[in-house]
Regions:
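N-terminal metal-binding scaffold of metallo-dependent hydrolase/deaminase domains
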Residues: 1-27, 38
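Alpha-helical scaffold segments that flank or form the walls of functional sites
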Residues: 12, 38, 54-120, 142-154
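Histidine-centered catalytic micro-motifs
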Residues: 41-53, 187-196
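Structural preference for beta-strand elements that scaffold enzyme active sites
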Residues: 44, 101-102, 122-124, 156-162, ...
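Active-site beta-loop-alpha junctions enriched in small/polar residues
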Residues: 49, 108-109, 128-132, 164-166, ...
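Active-site gating loops and adjacent loop-to-helix segments of metal-dependent hydrolytic enzymes
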Residues: 54-86, 120, 124-127, 195-240
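Active-site gating/metal-coordination segments in enzymes
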Residues: 101, 142-187
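Active-site-adjacent C-terminal substructures of enzyme catalytic domains
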Residues: 166-172, 224-226, 230-289
Length: 289
């Protein structure tokens, strides 16, 4: 927000639109007295997983990120639809009480889109996508395209695409999703440089993430480490331009290219603190680029 704070001012609204902010105070009988309040734009929660709200207090930090993912998958798979929807609505109400009026949410199950669209946020609902087998990229994108072609489910929401992370999405799928985002003019988002294992996975391979993929029957034996940082890797796949990059805990060497490609970084301090990470979130450095 820019500009001076207006104390004891008047805000005029016509047909739902703000038409004037002034220091005068009229005597209009329809005026609302909010003299004990602060009027300001609503907050934006740029990254959330409301579909996982029902798992609150059921997960704890694990010895490794891969172990935490295993626990999340196990608990999440046992959640019934009613509990999940109840959790989504509870999380939404908590956001509203905190002043959030707009959000970017990762939606793993398209069946939940009508529920998400009914929450009355201005929102971008990112279709979270996982697929490390290169051969499956075409089929995955065909299913996503059907969703993108569907009827709008809320006038306040739009769809985006979210390849989950560099360690869970194949190069072919990344490229295909980038093209799909351009075709349908929808925003693209990805978890990037969240954990040190991710950087190791792309540089030389990481046994813990490889083992996790193999357990899920998701490993592609043809895949080879590209020898790049997460940011360099996404740039090589031509999807870095204007990307909404989530977490960005390990990007110190990539700040210039992020600025050049107009990457929007979304930092998640509560998540970072919960996992006990210490080197993270170069907010000021990135803003100064």
């Amino acid at each position: 927000m820019c500009g001076e704070t207006v104390e004891n001012g008047e805000l005029t609204v016509d047909a739902g639109n703000i038409v004037e902010i002034s220091t005068s105070q009229g005597n209009d009988a329809t005026a609302l007295d909010l003299s004990d309040c602060l009027l300001m734009p609503g907050f934006v929660n740029a990254h959330s997983h409301l579909g996982l709200t029902a798992l609150e207090k059921k997960l704890s930090p694990a010895k490794s990120f891969a172990d935490w993912i295993r626990a999340l998958i196990s608990i999440n798979s046992g959640l019934d639809d009613e509990s999940r929807v109840r959790g989504i609505r509870a999380g939404a109400e908590e956001m509203k009480r905190s002043g959030v009026t707009a959000l970017g949410d990762y939606v793993a199950e398209p069946d939940l889109l009508p529920v998400m669209g009914g929450l009355e946020f201005r929102s971008v609902l990112f279709l979270e996508t996982i697929g490390f087998h290169s051969e499956k990229a075409l089929a995955i994108c065909k299913n996503l395209e059907e969703t993108l072609k569907g009827d709008p489910f809320s006038p306040l929401s739009r769809l985006g695409l979210a390849p989950h992370a560099p360690y869970s999405v194949s190069p072919n799928l990344f490229r295909s999703l980038g093209k799909l985002a351009q075709q349908y003019d929808c925003p693209l988002s990805c978890h990037v440089a969240e954990i040190p294992e991710e950087s190791g996975f792309l540089q030389n391979g990481d046994d813990s993430l490889e083992e996790l993929l193999k357990e899920r029957s998701a490993w592609d034996p043809k895949w080879k480490p590209p020898g790049k940082s997460p940011i360099e890797y996404l740039n090589s796949l031509n999807i870095l331009e204007s990307l909404l990059a989530i977490h960005c805990n390990f990007i110190a060497a990539d700040l210039d290219v992020m600025a050049l490609k107009k990457v929007s970084a979304v930092f998640c301090p509560k998540s970072t603190h919960w996992f006990g990470r210490k080197d993270f979130m170069p907010v000021r450095t990135l803003l100064d680029r």
